């Protein structure tokens, strides 16, 4: 027995796909943050440019220091707004001040808070070392691919280490290496 937690947009998309045979062509995006002129929720076609969605929210009230695609804990920073809305898009956050940049990252103090906070019972401290060393084999042995990228470890870290971002990058690296290895194996036959 377990639970499935989904947002309303996903539930509606499932209903429309199953009961009405409608493909997913629109997405509801939340545009918010202290740098957004008129925050709100916007239902936009997939492929719509992020800049167009921000314009629909009245644009920026002032130039943001930080723009994030996704939530505050699991979102990724945006450096360009000329990207399309996809089925995985959920929100655009724009902040006048970067809340993370105000506190400098310091070396890990091995307090173990990230280990305690991890809902998957992983070892973020060791995974981060493997990530910094770009050691994909070690990262996999530490079950780094099981990370759900929830952001809990980064949130509780007193050293303000970008743990979740490091794990996301490392998982992409592992997957890219696996694809390259598979392609090489297929090409060698």
Which residue ranges define each predicted feature?
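Active-site gating/interface segments in enzymes
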Residues: 58-109
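Structured core elements
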Residues: 4, 30, 41-43, 52, ...
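Ferredoxin-type iron-sulfur electron-transfer modules in oxidoreductases and energy-metabolism complexes
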Residues: 89-105, 115, 119-189
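Flexible loop/turn segments at secondary-structure boundaries
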Residues: 37-39, 51-52, 74-77, 100-101, ...
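Hydrophobic alpha-helical positions that pack around
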Residues: 1-50, 56-61, 71
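Catalytic cores of large soluble enzymes that bind and process phosphate-bearing ligands
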Residues: 2-10, 23, 41-45, 84, ...
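Short, mixed-charge, low-aromatic patches
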Residues: 6-13, 82-87, 124-126
